[in-house]
UniProtKB/Swiss-Prot annotation:
GO biological process: formaldehyde catabolic process
Lineage of the organism: Bacteria, Pseudomonadati, Pseudomonadota, Gammaproteobacteria, Enterobacterales
Protein name: S-formylglutathione hydrolase FrmB
Record EC number: 3.1.2.12
GO cellular component, one term: cytosol
Recorded catalytic activity of this chain's protein: S-formylglutathione + H2O = formate + glutathione + H(+)
Database matches in InterPro entries: AB_hydrolase_fold, Esterase-like, S-formylglutathione_hydrol
Entry coiled-coil feature ranges: none
Key words, A-Z: Hydrolase, Serine esterase
A UniProt-annotated Pfam family: Esterase
Its biological purpose: Serine hydrolase involved in the detoxification of formaldehyde. Hydrolyzes S-formylglutathione to glutathione and formate.
Species assigned in the record: Escherichia coli (strain ATCC 8739 / DSM 1576 / NBRC 3972 / NCIMB 8545 / WDCM 00012 / Crooks)
GO molecular function, one term: S-formylglutathione hydrolase activity
């Protein structure tokens, strides 16, 4: 991995690395925050998945997470949201193509050549992190919007791999809302069974489980009713007896002003779970 940025932050280092991804067949950037204790010991890892139009920079520059990661001794890994490059398929819209990988494995041309974000996040990236950084095998996952969707899907489909999961403003029923339907139709065609493999509410209804789900949702979020539908997740978790910590916040929107307001509580939540395991 090639170090391309290095910034001192709260006694540790906020770095950005570039590497070639075998899964995605392109160069990828990934942000890695190494807290002070990482200089002398191995630490657990929190993976953060960002939302539509984002790259590895949004979370590491806007959330203020470094303060809390340093306090709780957690390495934070923030990858890009899709494969990148002039040779990678793209679309003239913000919710498909580069910047909108949806953390799935595309099956349809032209997307299936590079869009294997599910494999990248689940397999390739953790292997790289374990090899290059002072990381233990314990990991948790979180994300925002499309990234919250990805975090929930990865945790629900791999409950033994992630100690805990949380999300900000996640797309919880993508097969039922425009963002998800448009992306799934392009990446997965009209195979509705494949769609449900990347739909948190559907996965839970089919019996997939995690110990607990933490979600924060702003009630002034312009996408809340049409695209996110957080109450669908709350309802299915109640029906399936999955413990939740779902909080609704008056006045907060979909932006990083919202994420930065509560990221400290999410990192503390994951730190507690990681230290218990």
């Amino acid at each position: 991995m090639e170090l391309i940025e290095k910034h001192a932050s709260f006694g540790g280092w906020q770095n950005v690395y570039r590497h070639y991804s075998q899964s995605l067949k392109c160069e990828m950037n990934v942000g890695v925050y190494l807290p002070p204790k990482a200089a002398n010991e191995k630490l657990p890892v929190l993976y953060w998945l960002s939302g539509l139009t984002c790259n590895e920079q949004n979370f590491i520059t806007k959330s203020g997470m470094q303060r809390y990661a340093a306090e709780h001794n957690i390495i934070v890994v923030a990858p890009d949201t899709s494969p990148r490059g002039s040779h990678v398929a793209d679309a003239d819209r913000y919710d498909l193509g580069q910047g909108a990988g949806f953390y799935l494995n595309a099956t349809q041309a032209p997307w299936n050549e590079h869009y294997k974000m599910y494999d990248y996040i689940r397999n390739e990236l953790p292997d790289l992190v374990m090899h290059h950084f002072p990381a233990t095998a314990k990991k948790s996952i979180s994300g925002h919007s499309m990234g919250g969707l990805g975090a929930l899907v990865l945790a629900l489909r791999n409950p033994d791999e992630y100690v805990s999961v949380s999300a900000f403003s996640p797309i919880v029923s993508p097969s039922q809302v425009p963002w998800g339907q448009q992306a799934f139709a392009a990446y997965l065609a009209e195979n509705k069974d494949a769609w449900l493999d990347y739909d948190p509410v559907s996965l839970i209804s089919q019996g997939q489980r995690v110990a607990e789900i933490m979600v924060d949702q702003g009630l002034s979020d312009d996408f809340y009713a049409e695209q996110l539908r957080t109450p669908n997740l709350e309802k299915i978790c109640q029906e399936m007896n999955i413990k939740t910590l779902i909080r609704y916040h008056e006045g907060y929107d979909h932006s990083y002003y919202f994420v930065s307001s509560f990221i400290g509580e999410h990192i503390a939540y994951h730190a507690n779970k990681l230290n218990m395991r």
